[in-house]
Amino acid sequence: TLLCREDIEIKGKRIAIVGCGRVGRPLSMMFVQFGGVPTLCNSSTNKFRPDTMEKIVGECDILVTCTGIYDIVNVDWIKDETVVIDVGVQRINDKLTGEINREKLNERNIIATPSPGGVGPMTVAMLMNNLTLAWYKQQNIEIMNSNHCDHFRWATDERDELLEE
């Protein structure tokens, strides 16, 4: 839904996922369901070597980093207008940061989630959404089969209106 909020289409997009653990592997399956073409870069494959990763990252439309390693992807590898989803959060010099060098990233024409503060709050929101859907299902309450993007847009538009008041 982070991508839905920004009207970013997944279908047909080349997606590089750096890290194939508890976050990367399920994300790759989700992207396939939405018509994306993911490539996983994992430490157990040759796709994790810097020269190979540079090529994969340089060709992707959407980049997801979820390794827990700061500066795992050189910002110079990322082409302009790439969408970057920085999942990882770590502490460096008593400051929380993501995996991508934010200073270098901000100098480029790249769309990126904040980190920290981007994926984490969205994860909590989706957990609450799934909990609500599970409760409805348990109570045998039929709900509209709506597009997740439309539902999310409605919820965030309502929130934004409340914040403006």
Predicted regions and their residues:
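Short, surface-exposed, polar/charged, turn-prone segments marking secondary-structure boundaries
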Residues: 44-46, 67-68, 91-93, 112-113, ...
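Glycine-rich phosphate/diphosphate-binding loop of Rossmann-like nucleotide-binding domains
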Residues: 1-77, 83, 97, 102-103
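Alpha-helix boundary/interfacial micro-motifs
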Residues: 29-30, 78, 85, 98, ...
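A charged, well-structured terminal subsegment
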Residues: 3-7, 133, 138-148
